[in-house]
Amino acid sequence: MAANGLMAASSVFLHRPVHPHFSFSSRTNQMVPLGFKGRVSFIGNVKRCFPVVLSMGKSETFEEAGNSVAPGNGISIMVNGCSGKMGKAVIKAADSAGVNIVPTSFGSVEEAGQTVEVCGKEILVHGPTEREKVLSSVFEKYPELIVVDYTIPSAVNDNAELYGKVGVPFVMGTTGGDRTRLYKTVEESKIYAVISPQMGKQVVAFLAAMEIMSEQFPGAFAGYSLEVMESHQASKLDASGTAKAVISCFQKLGVSYDMDQIQLIRDPKQQIEVVGVPEEHVSGHAFHLYHLTSPDKTVSFEFQHNVCGRSIYAEGTVDAVLFLAKKIRSKAEKRIYNMIDVLREGNMR
């Protein structure tokens, strides 16, 4: 798939190993040794591939659900972390969808007082000390406000507590933080929220398929060993939330694996030469590989999903905003929703 400079690929393959010690590089189709610690195995051309097909129940459409929300229909968003690349990408996607962008954002102490220009809009950044007063004022001025959070992992919990205190609905795209505390905070606040470790709709669909498989076939991979590699831009400090979600499914399928075994690749040189990340996307990509091997080494499975750019996440975030606005207007239950809920709603732009 290619759109707006974005390339995304999600694949699920069952295949026989081409060679027990080598696998193909996705870019060069040259064989790469698998014995080193940072081994990766992005498949180029594998002859014996069998698609795994899983089905889900019929999704409810916006027409069936009623209370549909057209893009830009009175919705206003405040993007916290607007100076970052994801924040800017969301603003551009929301602006294209006709959603009103509030000219206010939260940032670090160093960013306080700065103005960020995105899509011809000047957005004033406020520091931590004045957040509650500013957010309350913005929410009063824009009663259909939805906050979008793309800040930093260390700010996740404090930000969620603030949103709950003010009562403003939000979409949390920031990963990291104390997730147990995050969910507890939002549940106790009884507000509308979409929280997901992954905002890319197609990747979320893959995650949903993994969930279905783990629920329907628990223990199917008992005894298998698992290797997980994920490569992101160097600015991403934490391990991939998506990788953790997929690993959780494998654990339900009977695989023993600790999250600290995830191979994080952040070195640009290795990303280009070994992983196969296009050089122009080193500063913004998300490559994931999961390799399963049977106890006797005669069977192997590989699952991979690779994304270059940020458009897929920005577009998914806007869909989450529209979904949340619909829930608010229909007076649906105030609770935490996720991107699978957004997908099941059935309105993909």
From Swiss-Prot:
It is an enzyme of class 1 (oxidoreductase). GO terms for biological process: diaminopimelate biosynthetic process; lysine biosynthetic process via diaminopimelate. InterPro entries: DapB_C (IPR022663), DapB_N (IPR000846), DHDPR_bac (IPR023940), Dihydrodipicolinate_Rdtase_pln (IPR011859), NAD(P)-bd_dom_sf (IPR036291). NAD(+) binds at G81, C82, S83, G84, K85, M86, G173, T174, T175, S196, P197, Q198, M199. It is found in: Plastid, Chloroplast. (S)-2,3,4,5-tetrahydrodipicolinate binds at G241, T242. The active site is at H232, K236. Pathway: Amino-acid biosynthesis; L-lysine biosynthesis via DAP pathway; (S)-tetrahydrodipicolinate from L-aspartate: step 4/4. Its EC number is 1.17.1.8. Residues 1-53 form a transit peptide. Keywords: Amino-acid biosynthesis, Chloroplast, Diaminopimelate biosynthesis, Lysine biosynthesis, NAD, NADP, Oxidoreductase, Plastid, Transit peptide. PANTHER family: 4-HYDROXY-TETRAHYDRODIPICOLINATE REDUCTASE 1, CHLOROPLASTIC-RELATED (PTHR20836:SF0), DIHYDRODIPICOLINATE REDUCTASE (PTHR20836). This is 4-hydroxy-tetrahydrodipicolinate reductase 2, chloroplastic. It comes from Arabidopsis thaliana (Mouse-ear cress).
